[in-house]
Amino acid sequence: TKAVIIADGGFEGIFNGTGIGFGMDLALQSGIPLRDMEFISKTPFGVTNSKLTLSSNMLGYGANLCDTSGNTITAENFVQLCDVTAQSSGAVIDGRDMGDDKVWWQSAFRTVKSSTGVDMNKYTVGLENRVNQTLGGIATDECGRAVIGSWSRWFTGLYAAGDAACSGLNGAGALPGNRLLDALSGGSSSGNHASEWVKDQSFSNTDNLLASLE
């Protein structure tokens, strides 16, 4: 192998049973330290009694976030929204009055109905706060290279991207939409650098490989 790009998910599965961070574990067992593991991102749009998470963009298309009494829940930013919903007696999302924009969300509606039995065209859906993204991981530089030591020495041949990487793009808290941006930019940087770097490199452990074939 000339180069390896670790580009799997984070470890939010510790909290919600989805991604469990195999790539990070592989790096850690290879002696590569992980960075900023204390930083996580929460969402108030986790569908209760399921592993589903709805997009906050639904609010911009006419859906309403309410408490169990029907009062609209508002906040100045996403972090505050998480705090407000956590302090309320319960939260629901109402997608019944989204008008013509509802057609764009029918896939999400069908997924919710398949998982919970609730038809969002007719009923509200209960929500809960949950961890949906972890921000720590394999420290990378601007080229997507895994860095160690004082975060300045490359672990030669290793790259990371996506939720497995800690690029610094998100800081201590991710904004909605930046997860995709981080994955795209990290994947592009690591892929481009790796493809150029391997042109002048030899395969590692070639002698051992050839010896095993004799």
What are these regions (language model features)?
Residues 1, 38-174:
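Mobile, glycine/GP-rich and aromatic-enriched active-site lid/loop segments adjacent to catalytic centers
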Residues 1-5, 9-15, 69-76, 211-214:
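Short, intrinsically disordered, charge-balanced linker/junction segments flanking boundaries
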Residues 3-52, 176-193:
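Glycine-rich loop(s) and the adjacent beta-strand/alpha-helix scaffold that form part
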